[in-house]
Design a protein with these regions (language model features):
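Histidine-acidic metal/acid-base catalytic patches
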Residues: 1-28, 54, 58-61, 153-168, ...
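Active-site acidic/histidine proton-transfer and metal-coordination neighborhood
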Residues: 16-22, 56-59, 76-169, 178-180, ...
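A short acidic, helix-capping loop that chelates divalent metal ions and anchors anionic groups
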Residues: 38-41, 73-78, 111-116, 178-179, ...
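A generic secondary-structure micro-motif detector
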Residues: 10, 42-43, 81, 120, ...
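Active-site beta-loop-alpha junctions enriched in small/polar residues
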Residues: 9-13, 35-37, 69-72, 108-110, ...
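Short, well-structured secondary-structure segments
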Residues: 30-36, 63-66, 103-105
């Protein structure tokens, strides 16, 4: 088995990069999947700010593994695709400064109540053009399964990764649970296309997020298969308590189920608990 590299969405510990660094260091993380910095979304920071963040991370021996971008978390019917392509190029430039190998992205929200199949060709066309925009940059676009987007279940994720060959996959067990998808069946279909995993778990009964290994995501079984298949990189995504940027991750009208069965006195405590849950799964 190869060495395991563990990263985190440390904005769930602190909105400030200094607090994120301390959270990663005390939990033995290698670095960040960077999503929000000092109250700003990663795509909104200046290039100079990115250089400053890179220096702070370098000084503590930490790296940025991926940009946890929101690209593709817009409606498929929105007339904003030129802006999406511009965001890809901006993300690539930030990734180069920060030293990130990957950009996490999504496959567009489908209108509520509509059959996703109606939008199949439009989604694939957009994702293909996004992949073309990043071609030759040295940065990989990684599609994450997410509630409400075209790629919310295993079958459509497989279709995306098969038809847009330049993309690789991010496997999020909790998001599959929240879509009613059996995660092991999803893994069997997608495993060969997965570049890294988000360590996050949830319950079928109420969609609430729980520590990894405590839910219905079969995280232990899938993690074992991922590592045996040559996988190396994991991102801890706690979602165990409300944090500053949570509302920016949700579709309008939706609310994440966090902080239910498991309660923590602070965002730092919830972050530490999520890291500990992964350590227990890894043995």
């Amino acid at each position: 088995m190869k060495d395991i590299h563990i990263y985190a969405f440390a904005d769930e510990a602190s909105p400030m990069v200094d607090g994120q660094i301390e959270a990663m260091v005390r939990n033995g993380m290698q670095g960040l999947e960077i999503r929000n910095v000092d109250g700003e979304n990663i795509l909104d920071i200046s290039l100079q700010k990115a250089r400053e963040v890179r220096k702070k991370l370098d000084d503590r021996g930490l790296k940025v593994w991926a940009l946890g971008s929101p690209i593709g978390k817009t409606g498929i019917e929105e007339d904003n695709f030129p802006k999406v392509l511009s965001s890809i190029m901006n993300a690539v430039e930030l990734a180069h400064i920060l030293g990130a190998e990957n950009i996490r992205m999504f496959s567009f929200y489908i209108p509520a109540g509509q059959d996703p199949a109606r939008y199949q060709s439009q989604v694939i066309d957009r994702l293909s053009r996004m992949a073309e925009a990043a071609e030759g940059s040295g940065v990989t676009l990684c599609h994450e399964n997410e509630k409400g987007i075209y790629g919310d279940n295993a079958a459509r994720c497989e279709e995306i990764l098969r038809k847009v060959g330049a993309l690789q996959g991010v496997f999020d067990p909790a998001n599959f649970v929240q879509c009613g998808q059996d995660t092991w069946e999803a893994w069997k279909l997608l495993g060969s296309k997965i570049k890294y995993m988000h360590i996050k778990d949830a319950l079928f009964k109420d969609n609430s997020v729980v520590p990894a290994g405590k839910g219905d995501g079969q995280v232990d079984k899938i993690l074992k298969a991922f590592l045996e298949n040559g996988g190396e990189c994991l991102t801890v995504e706690p979602h165990l308590t409300v944090f500053d940027a949570l509302k920016t991750l949700e579709r309008e009208g939706e609310k994440s189920r966090v902080g239910g069965a498991y309660a923590y006195p602070s965002s730092d405590a919830a972050f530490d608990a999520a890291c500990q849950a992964l350590r227990e799964l890894l043995g």
